[in-house]
Amino acid sequence: MIEIKISKIPRWDEINKIVKLREKDLVLLKLPKSVYEHPKMAYKLEYLKKKGIFIEVENAKRGRKRKVDDETVKKIHELIIEGYSVREIGNILGIGKSTVWDYAKDCIKELKLERFKKLVWEYREYLINKGKYSPSLQVLFLELEATVDYDLEKAKKILEDIIKHVKEF
């Protein structure tokens, strides 16, 4: 099998060379998504497929990841926990939102969960200070703490029960 990697839109003479290679052996043509989806490639891809050439789209990112120091990465995580959006964080730190997203996407779920827990604790403290924290609320908060890590839907229902209970109190 012959593998050919292309990173630009091929000319027709280049396509004919690929077709000639097909006469000798199977041909696998690898190209980036941007080239695959380009309007000029529609007829060329159709022609190649008719000639028995296999086409594979590579999803690899082009270029290098922008380097950000560890201190900035920590700041990105702190700002996410505080509730800032990716765009706002980019504006605050003076870096692009795609760079912020690159460094946040792997742990954003955990960071948002941490923010949620922080808000629950603040709400609990607020209720204690206002004198609305009762034993039944304490049980609901304990149940919320136990479920928040593994079942967010159940945690949401418990939180709704807490809010309903506070409004009735």
Curated annotation (Swiss-Prot):
<dbReference type="GO" id="GO:0000150">
    <property type="term" value="F:DNA strand exchange activity"/>
</dbReference>
<dbReference type="InterPro" id="IPR009057">
    <property type="entry name" value="Homeodomain-like_sf"/>
</dbReference>
<dbReference type="GO" id="GO:0003677">
    <property type="term" value="F:DNA binding"/>
</dbReference>
<protein>
    <recommendedName>
        <fullName>Uncharacterized protein MJ0769</fullName>
    </recommendedName>
</protein>
<dbReference type="InterPro" id="IPR006120">
    <property type="entry name" value="Resolvase_HTH_dom"/>
</dbReference>
<dbReference type="Pfam" id="PF02796">
    <property type="entry name" value="HTH_7"/>
</dbReference>
